[in-house]
Amino acid sequence: RRTVKSAPQ
């Protein structure tokens, strides 16, 4: 997959 920005935890 392409890199996706994860939501800040």
From Swiss-Prot:
The keyword Transferase is assigned to this record: no
The record's free-text note on cofactor binding: Binds at least 14 chlorophylls (8 Chl-a and 6 Chl-b) and carotenoids such as lutein and neoxanthin.
PTM summary: Photoregulated by reversible phosphorylation of its threonine residues.
Cellular component GO terms, alphabetical: chloroplast thylakoid membrane; photosystem I; photosystem II
UniProt entry keywords in alphabetical sequence: Acetylation, Chlorophyll, Chloroplast, Chromophore, Magnesium, Membrane, Metal-binding, Phosphoprotein, Photosynthesis, Photosystem I, Photosystem II, Plastid, Thylakoid
UniProt GO MF annotations: chlorophyll binding; metal ion binding
Domain of life: Eukaryota
Subunit description: The LHC complex consists of chlorophyll a-b binding proteins.
Assigned protein family: Belongs to the light-harvesting chlorophyll a/b-binding (LHC) protein family.
Protein name per UniProt: Chlorophyll a-b binding protein
